[in-house]
């Protein structure tokens, strides 16, 4: 019997899933419940043959969502397995593991207690991740479950990279430091880029750019992360769809006073109303931004310039931090698909050893080398596959 692993990613109002056949690492079926706990909840299902279905279903909370997803997996019409007993284990995306987790682990009661203690670091995500784990526990007691942490890959950062220059007791008392996110993606693409280029991770200095609606960059030396752009929360670093990224702390207190905002109001402004959407007063989607900029919208053009510039700056900074640069990787929704972003970011970077080839850059969502043949630094596009990484980690821990 082939091993089958179910991957779950529970957000505050969504549950994404994928069922893997680990013999050939293929996706048997995948989908997601959306609007969990809200009116008009539904589940999207993608079958192995590529056919898509949308099913309206009332999902008041996560346990009901997981239960319904289980019923779809064994459904006589659209299911892909005869019985839930065919599932060997469940792998979960866990957002914030704090300093407690530097690798994927089997989710024992002890582990879950430690994870719960990290909840104030990710008050939206961690409780939702836990709900997914508890739902599986309730529905299929005894089924092995594995946690794969977004923060784990970045736990190799040295203190000089992760500490903030604030009173030290804030770190000791509350764990305030840089943690970084998208770690599973950075880990996957950094390893995959080496395979794709036929090089060893040892001795390679790489910058991985995970650019989606949320974005982060990591400096990876010898296959290990030494710095990353997101911080205590996913708000620091790059300019994003709705997040501000790097901003002067003094500007934050200034805005709070001017607008009479409390901490929650300020957090909402920086996380939900800033970034591309905040600057343009419109969409946070880079495709909309690109067409608006092309049609002469000044503010869209400014937002786009700022967005590209911030990525370019981080690549330069991390090349300095690593003392060199061998590979730049672009991944995630924008990184894999936006040709103009890659082109602008890599422009005028010859001094760093990046020689770009526009003719090779015309790719979307596929693995490709987009630097010139004689470029000292290789620039590649590697589509990320966090779910496969989670499934693989889960299999390896059984």
Task: Walk through the language-model features, giving the residues of each.
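Internal helix-turn-beta structural module
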Residues: 301, 305-321, 325, 335-398
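Short glycine-rich, Thr/Ser-proximal phosphate-binding strand/loop in the N-terminal lobe
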Residues: 5, 14-60, 231
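Glycine-rich phosphate-binding loop of actin/hexokinase-like ATP-binding domains
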Residues: 153-256
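Catalytic phosphate/nucleotide-handling subdomain of diverse soluble enzymes
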Residues: 221, 227-262, 268, 332-363
């Amino acid at each position: 019997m082939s091993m089958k692993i179910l991957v779950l990613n529970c957000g505050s109002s969504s549950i994404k899933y994928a069922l893997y056949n680990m013999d050939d690492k293929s996706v048997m079926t995948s989908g997601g419940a959306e609007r969990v706990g809200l009116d008009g909840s539904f589940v999207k299902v993608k079958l192995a043959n590529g056919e898509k279905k949308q099913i309206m279903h009332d999902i008041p909370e996560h346990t009901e969502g997981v239960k319904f997803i289980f019923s779809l997996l064994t459904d006589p019409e659209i299911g892909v397995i005869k019985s839930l007993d065919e599932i060997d284990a469940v792998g979960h995306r866990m957002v914030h593991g704090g300093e407690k987790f530097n690798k994927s682990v089997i989710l024992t009661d002890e582990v879950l207690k430690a994870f719960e203690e990290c909840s104030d670091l990710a008050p939206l995500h961690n409780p939702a991740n836990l709900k997914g784990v508890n739902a599986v526990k309730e529905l299929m007691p005894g089924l092995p479950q594995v946690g794969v942490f977004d923060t784990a890959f970045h736990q190799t950062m040295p203190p000089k990279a992760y500490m903030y220059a604030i009173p030290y007791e804030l770190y000791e008392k509350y764990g305030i430091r840089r943690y970084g996110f998208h770690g599973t993606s950075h880990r996957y693409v950094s390893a995959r880029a080496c395979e794709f280029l036929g090089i060893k991770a040892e001795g390679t200095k790489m910058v991985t750019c995970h650019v989606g609606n949320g974005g982060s960059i990591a400096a990876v030396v010898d296959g290990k992360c030494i710095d990353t752009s997101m911080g205590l929360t996913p708000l620091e670093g790059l300019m994003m769809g709705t997040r501000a990224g790097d901003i002067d702390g003094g500007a934050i207190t200034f805005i709070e006073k001017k607008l009479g905002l409390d901490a929650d109001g300020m957090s909402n402004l920086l996380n939900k109303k800033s970034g591309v959407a905040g600057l343009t007063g419109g969409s946070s989607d880079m495709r909309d931004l690109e067409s608006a900029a092309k049609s002469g919208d000044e503010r869209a053009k400014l937002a786009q310039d700022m967005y590209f510039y911030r990525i370019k700056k981080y690549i330069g900074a991390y090349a300095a931090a690593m003392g060199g640069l061998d590979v730049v990787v672009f991944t995630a929704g924008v990184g894999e698909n936006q040709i103009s972003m890659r082109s602008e970011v890599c422009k005028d970077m010859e001094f760093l050893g990046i020689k770009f080839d526009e003719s090779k850059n015309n790719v979307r969502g596929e693995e490709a080398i987009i630097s010139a043949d004689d470029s000292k630094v290789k620039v590649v596009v590697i589509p990320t596959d966090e779910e496969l990484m989670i499934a693989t980690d889960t299999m390896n821990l059984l």
